[in-house]
Amino acid sequence: MDTDILVIGAGLAGCACAAAAAEKGGKVTVVEKTSSWNGRGGGFGAINSHYMDELGIEVDKVNAKQHWIAQCASRANEDLIVKFFNSSEEASNWLLAKAEAVGGSAMVGAFYSHDDVYAEQPGYHMLMIPEEAGLTSTGFAGAELCYNDAVKDGAEFVFDSPAVQLVKDGTKVTGCICEGKDGYVQYNASKGVVLCTGDIGGNLEMCKAYAPICVEYGQPRSQYTDRKST
């Protein structure tokens, strides 16, 4: 199967990626191991969204980044943290526009820690979507909004299709092989493969390889975690 952009995983990240690529005209295929898209949690964190602007809330990005890195004992991926802070405003306003398009809005919560040592930043956004918008999930509305828009713009979602192996051309990842009900299917992406498969917290092998400090705290398992991974 050939596509432009292959997205592995249909959670919030995967649905958002698919929606963003499809709205720009890309041929997008999303493969997901469960039987539906997924979205959990009631809200999302953002830095300096337009809702925060309207409330007069401004986050000092430099101070907040330094505090975040310090709380992680300087073991975090600083490049990734910087990218979050620099891209958060644009990305959050993009998602908020999708909520507003169906008559929704967002509440910016004030329930965050003001402690000097474990201080948090304002910016928790809870999406408020009217019933007449017709959303079907009790999970995070943002994921469903992105899924609906991605489908509307032509993205294809293939469910019950876990990716079992990445396909490479030299050092470049060019696709993946999925195991579906009718056997194995190879997907080839001409423009890129995006991994949106969540964290590795439930995978003992990957924790040992990439985050051994996590191993001593035990490996939680949920319905989203392959029993063999633990």
Cite the ranges covered by each PLM segment:
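Conserved redox-cofactor binding core of oxidoreductases
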Residues: N86-Y184, S190, L204-E205
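Glycine-rich FAD pyrophosphate-binding loop
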Residues: A22-G43
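Short glycine-enriched loops at secondary-structure junctions
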Residues: T34, H50-M52, F111-S113, V193, ...
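N-terminal Rossmann-like FAD-binding beta1-loop-alpha1 element of flavoenzymes
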Residues: I5-T29
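Glycine-rich loop(s) and the adjacent beta-strand/alpha-helix scaffold that form part
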Residues: K181-G183, N188-S229
